[in-house]
Regions:
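Short S/T/G/P-rich N-terminal loop/turn motif that feeds into the first structured element of a domain
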Residues: 1-27, 39, 43, 54, ...
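Short, structured coil segments at secondary-structure junctions
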Residues: 29, 64-67
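A short linear hydrophobic-aromatic micro-motif
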Residues: 30-37, 70
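Helix N-cap motif at beta-to-alpha junctions
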Residues: 49-55
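Conserved short beta-strand edge segments in small beta-sheet-based binding/regulatory domains
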Residues: 66-78
Length: 78
């Protein structure tokens, strides 16, 4: 499955909500969180997601009212 990284503001999400998202099963758009990296001091959140396509990532965020600053398809060395 393709992998994506995106960035957006952390607020209004809480650390508890991030943990729930990290452990959540695949959503209705086919998206799962591989990792969530954040900085509370800079109010910045980076999501590493597995998703069928960029549109699924957009819908995943739109559902909770978040618009990412960017979404990029990425590869890993693993």
């Amino acid at each position: 499955m393709p992998k994506f990284i995106d960035a957006h503001k952390m607020n209004p999400l809480t650390k508890q909500q991030l943990k729930q998202a990290q452990n959540a099963p695949k959503d209705e758009f086919g998206v799962t969180h591989e990792n969530i990296i954040y900085s509370e001091t800079e109010n910045k959140l980076f999501c590493v997601l597995n998703a069928p396509n960029k549109e699924a990532v957009e819908k995943h965020h739109r559902k909770i009212g978040i618009k990412p600053d960017y979404i990029h398809e990425v590869k890993t060395t693993k």
